[in-house]
């Protein structure tokens, strides 16, 4: 199997996944009890006003007509218009998506910076106290609800210790940096505004740590398993017999090979972080897509909910496509094996 044939296969998979998400999200969103026109008009509005709003939104048409119109607009890059705000969904996503992406990237960075060293040490000190601690962290991270964990760290670090802010991206008295990327940290650096940078960094610590905690243990366990496999290989025994220092063998021989199979897990982690940001943003009043889509669901804003699902699923599949191609580029044997 050539690189281009695998790329073509993965792209078809991307299209099928996004198409499936569109269909499922459309069906589920329209099965939710309630009338968006009634919510938009208010409880005191007459039936004639509600019916007029329903006609303006196209909600009086059959579902297959609404779906056809939605798909047609989607192919033109139009995600529809928010029922709640009256603005294009794509415009709202451009406002809220950078905040979610910044949070997800920082959480992934924390998970890697902490999880990889823990995984290495856990493999080197196998079945010792650190290895058991990492195992407990992994189980705790997977089993602890992000919502509960977020409330816990807010109560501890903001309520009792009062050493970190409990919500938002910036203090109320600070103006956001000039919008370039939508990432406050990066925009503040580009603007040369150190005060905004450090304030945004303080606000990012608690939500990023909360979001990273789940994947920190997973990354550590994945690195540990891959390291143990590499440390048992013959080339490691030869390196030890050659008199090379132990730390040099671990970092320069075992670790690079252990990172290769871990790439797939890291790609999945970034996709999971985008979805996991929904609850985390709600707890920390983080003005990203999570809080926005929760409000949209509560107010039966179908176009906004479907736009969120399409964008996040596309980002998730795209990240995994890049990871698969990177994995193939690093280890071409996968492509040759697939061809056989």
Task: Enumerate the language-model features and the residues they cover.
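N-terminal signal-anchor/first transmembrane alpha helix
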Residues: 1-60, 90, 94, 121, ...
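Alpha-helical transmembrane segments of integral membrane proteins
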Residues: 2-6, 97-130, 176-340
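An internal, D/E-rich "acidic patch" concept
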Residues: 3, 60-116
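Residue-level recognition of pore/gate-forming positions within transmembrane alpha-helices
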Residues: 14, 22, 44, 111-112, ...
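Hydrophobic alpha-helical transmembrane segments of membrane transport/permease proteins
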Residues: 17-68, 157-196
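Hydrophobic alpha-helical transmembrane segments
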Residues: 42-58, 149-159, 206-211, 248-265
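Hydrophobic alpha-helical segments embedded in or immediately adjacent to the lipid bilayer
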Residues: 117-121, 130-180
